[in-house]
């Protein structure tokens, strides 16, 4: 379970980093790419956290 928590935390950190890159990007295509990546990383972290929460209730 700890490895899943660590994975979720890492994905959230990656999402934050992707958002930083998106904010500083001058190229529109690059900005949109990193915005999509940030959303994707957050979604993955949410899924992991949902599995963790579901396992706690079992």
What annotation goes with each model-predicted range?
Residues 1-58:
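Long, non-catalytic architectural segments outside compact domain cores
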